[in-house]
């Protein structure tokens, strides 16, 4: 069986030698237990307000005041207490409120009042009108970019994920390298060209596109005591996270 990156939660601990990471990096953490899969007839939104939370996040993001990477990092910056007690969409709304204030779109007082208290930034041209929503959702946010950075690996190469795991540009910054993959050896399955590097883009340091690869790992290379050690896991990994095996 081959698994993609999404939804990889496991009862087993991470591979030996993996360092600790921030709370949001939950793949393979010990003690969280298995995640029961949703049934085929499960509703898209468990509660009505979940749909509104998604709509608010998309409409606010369309204002162009931050990147997707920055919004992810904003949610990662929630206090550990809030992160553990909030539901999925509560994390979204709390991170959204924080980033709206941080970027000057609104103020804390306006959040509390539930209305505008001063002249708002002129963002009317970026307003996501209803007739544009479907097109915006279907087109997504392409991250493929031209880059002068040379790809160091080819399909079939054996690679090792670097152990550092942290953002090398910003202390405590955003990283898309999951803890459970650090130090693991895998094989390059696909090369996707150069894509926006989240470690840089999340902090306003530019898109800094880097080569992006799909790397396949044996499950046993990621988790000791894997129930099905010959299963494979495929992760999309940027070049700065990799080194030759």
Where is each model-derived feature located?
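Basic/aromatic-rich interaction segments and small domains that mediate binding to polyanionic partners
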Residues: 29-57, 95, 100-103, 143-155, ...
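Solvent-exposed, non-transmembrane amphipathic alpha-helical segments
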Residues: 76, 80, 91, 116, ...
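Short N-terminal segments
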Residues: 9-19, 134, 139, 145, ...
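N-terminal intrinsically disordered, low-complexity, charge/repeat-rich segments that act as generic
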Residues: 3-125
């Amino acid at each position: 069986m081959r698994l993609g990156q999404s939804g990889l939660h496991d009862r087993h601990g991470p591979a030996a030698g993996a360092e600790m990471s921030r709370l949001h990096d939950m793949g393979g953490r010990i003690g969280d237990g298995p995640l029961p899969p949703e049934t085929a007839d499960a509703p898209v939104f468990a509660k009505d307000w979940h749909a509104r939370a998604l709509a608010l996040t998309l409409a606010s993001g369309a204002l162009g005041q931050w990147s997707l990477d920055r919004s992810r990092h904003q949610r990662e910056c929630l206090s550990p207490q809030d992160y553990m007690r909030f539901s999925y969409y509560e994390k979204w709304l709390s991170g959204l409120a924080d980033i709206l204030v941080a970027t000057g779109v609104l103020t804390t007082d306006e959040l509390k009042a539930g209305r505008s208290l001063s002249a708002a930034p002129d963002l009317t041209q970026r307003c996501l009108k209803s007739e544009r929503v479907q097109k915006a959702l279907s087109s997504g946010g392409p991250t493929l970019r031209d880059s002068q950075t040379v790809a160091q690996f080819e399909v079939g190469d054996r690679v090792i994920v670097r152990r550092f795991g942290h953002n090398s540009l910003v202390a405590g910054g955003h990283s898309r390298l999951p803890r459970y993959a650090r130090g693991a050896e895998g094989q390059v399955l696909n090369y996707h060209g150069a894509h926006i590097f989240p470690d840089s883009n999340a902090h306003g340091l530019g898109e800094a596109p880097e080569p992006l690869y799909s790397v396949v790992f044996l499950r046993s290379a990621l988790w000791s005591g894997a129930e099905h050690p010959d299963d494979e896991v495929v992760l999309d990994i940027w070049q700065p996270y990799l080194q030759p095996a």
